[in-house]
Every structure is written in C-alpha cells, then in structure tokens.
Amino acid sequence: MCIRDSIYSVIIGKSFSSSSLGFYNQAHKMQTVPSEAIRSIIMTASYPIIANEKNPNKRYDLYLSVFSKFTFIVSAMVFLLMAVSDFAFYALLGEKWIPAAPLFSIFILITLTFPQKVVNANIIKIQGDSALYRNLSLLDTVLRIIALLVTMTYSLEMIVVGQVVAAFISAYTYTACCGKRIGFSTKKQYRIWYSIMWKPLAAFFVSKVILSFFKMGYWGDMFSAVFFLVVLCSLCELTKDHTYINLKTIYITYLKKLCK
C-alpha cells in the first residue's frame, strides 16, 4: 500500500503543482483513515467467527450477514461524509484545505467496494487459497496504476475518478473469483449491495436538495448531516429494511447493557 501510494505521488508530482499534490494526498488520507478503521474492525470481528464455524450452511449465513451489515455501515458512512465534506475539511484542517474536499468526496466512493473485497477475501483466506488472494491484491494494484497512467494527463478530479473505477472493477473481480466457491454468486452480492446502498444514496441527495434552498456556508453541512440521518432512518423504517432493523436491535441491546 505504501509503495503504491508513493508511486502515485511521484507520478502526480511530475504532472501537477506541489499544492495540487498536497490536496490529492490530503483527500486520500482523509478517505483512508475512517475507511481502513471500519475495514479493520469488520475483519477482526468477523474472521475468527466465520473461520471457526464448520457447518457450511451456517458459515454461508454468516457471510451473508456480515456482507449485509458491512454494506449498510459503509454506505451510510460514505454518504454522510460526503454530506459534511466541506465542513469537515474546514473544521479539521482549515480553510486553505477546502479545495481537497471535492477530491475527498470522489475518493470516499472507493470505500463502497470494501464489502465485496473484504468478505470475498475472507472466503479464500479461510479456504487457504493464499495464491488467489495474492493475485487479486496484485491485480488491484495494477488496475489502479493503469488508471493513473490513463488519467494523469487530465485533471486531478479525473485521476481520482479513475481510481474509483479501478476499485469497482477490482471488487467485481473479487466477487467473480471468490463468491462462487460457496454459492454466493456475483449477481446475488450486487443485488444485496444495491438493495441496501440506494437508501443512503437517496438520503444524501434529498438532504443536499433541501439545503440548496438555504445559504449557510460550511455550517450548512451539519444540517445536511441531520437531514441525511433523518431521511435514511425514515426510508429504512418505511421499507422495513432487515439489515437496519438488525443493527438497530444490536445497538439498543448494547445500550441497555451499558445502562445496567
């Protein structure tokens, strides 16, 4: 990861100014911190549970459960962070870093591919196929370097879009190569992914449209976040989203234990 990022920085540094490279690196860093934290937590919590389950049917159900919950958490986080990106950069880094916020809003879309990559990587790691895991990781790096070389003559925004496209192609490859081993087909994975992801996406657009009628500057992002959460929860309640209800039950149970 560090070597790959260094290659990106060198190539971008040769084509753009040092300030543009700084905005790119800062946007990437802001995307990486929350995304990797979520991925690490999910992998640490789910891997031993799934690996210790010997019944194939129960293991399949665990994969399905982890995939659904992971997708909901990640998609909600991604679109919430997109909603507050300007304010986050302004509050955490200062006004001079605001130009990095649009790059971050594109970069963070890469995180939407994490459920496919993490769950499918777990499938082959538990099966002990280290060669396939290594090849898929290498393919991911190659795809992103190719995307960078193709887009480097354009704008920084196009470079980041290229990285997002490469990440989605890589995620599709993970689903095609790994999921079929346990009957968790690519079609089924993306059907679940879309059925969950459209709600946070809709909540994001609704919150942005509502706030577009008001001029509140960076602080408007905070109201956008509130609208986003209200709309998302309302959509999930109206559609009786099973993943949302399950996560809500887990959260309420956890709070009750804390209050005892």
Identify the function of each model-found stretch:
Residues M1-I3:
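Short, small-residue-biased leader/transition segments that mark boundaries at the very start
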Residues D5, H28, M43, P102-L148, ...:
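Short runs within selected transmembrane alpha-helices of multi-pass transporters and secretion channels
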Residues Y8-V10, G22-R39, S68-K69, I110, ...:
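Alpha-helical transmembrane segments of polytopic membrane transporters and translocases
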Residues I11-T32, D61-L62, I98-F104:
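Interfacial/gating helices of multi-pass transporter permease domains
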Residues A27, Q31-S68, A121-I126:
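Helix-loop junctions and terminal segments of transmembrane helices
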Residues P56-M77, L136, R191-I196:
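Membrane-water interface segments that mark the loop-to-transmembrane alpha-helix transition
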Residues Y63-F114, I145-T153, L201-F204, V209-F214:
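Alpha-helical transmembrane segments of multi-pass membrane transport and lipid-handling proteins
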Residues F184, F205-K260:
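Membrane-proximal transmembrane or re-entrant/amphipathic helices at the cytosolic face
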